[in-house]
Amino acid sequence: AALLTASCTPALKVEVANTTPTERDDETVEIAWSEVAALKGVTPDNIVVLNDDNEQIPSQVLFRGGTEPQALIFQTDADPMESKRFKLVAGQRENYPAEAFGRTVPERYDDYAWENNKVAYRLYGPALETSPEKLVTPGIDVWVKCTDKLVIDEWYARGNYHHNYGDGMDCYKVGVTLGSGASLPFAGGKFWMMGHNYATAHTLDNGPIRTSVELTYAPFDVDGTPVTLTKIISLDANQRFNRMDNIYDC
């Protein structure tokens, strides 16, 4: 839980409370930009988050694919029942290292790949349908990593991600399965597979803390009804799990 209060100095005070009996590591704190904007003179280019020792910590302004700021995020640890205090001020943002990244990979049949400092994933794109492999699948592929660095660009450039060169590898075969975390509609007593890989991919935000993408799928048959799918995926630094919103429209 987060509480915002104003102070006499040009700053917003944020109190983050862990009200559970469980230690929380690298939890993402998200504050609506409408609340941040109450700080006079603040912009996405100068917003700074300070911890209780007055040290700047990495933060990211989310745009969610638009041109206007939507939210501010940063990460923190918290012991059970612990509260931590932060300040939001206008200042000089440091050059935070990117720990989350995603992009379309046209050089590999339009894969969409995304990662953080712990793990990488990919979905298969439209060009793969007409490749020699001719693969159509909603499945999500997982790349395991032995490094905290971002690897997508390097592994694709290397041309072989099925061998571990010391920084991890792709050791799973997705095929026509759901892979790691994909979903399908269930109707009329059966699952219904889409007829194509994703049609469009739009990166919404891209680090340093969160990468997110919106993917759309062409209409496919679900028990006699044409259905479209919009999939929104986000991955935060230091986490191994994605958030996925699957929006089916018929």
What are these regions (language model features)?
Residues P10-G102, L135:
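Alpha-mannosidase-like glycoside hydrolase catalytic domains involved in N-glycan trimming
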Residues L12-N18, K118, K231, N242-Y248:
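Short, well-ordered beta-strand segments enriched in hydrophobic/aromatic residues
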Residues R85-K87, E214, R243-I247:
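Residues within well-ordered beta-strands of beta-sheet-rich folds
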Residues K87, Q92-W192:
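Solvent-exposed N-terminal domain segments of exported/luminal and surface proteins
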Residues D153-N238:
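Extended, loop-rich substrate-binding clefts of extracytoplasmic carbohydrate-active enzymes
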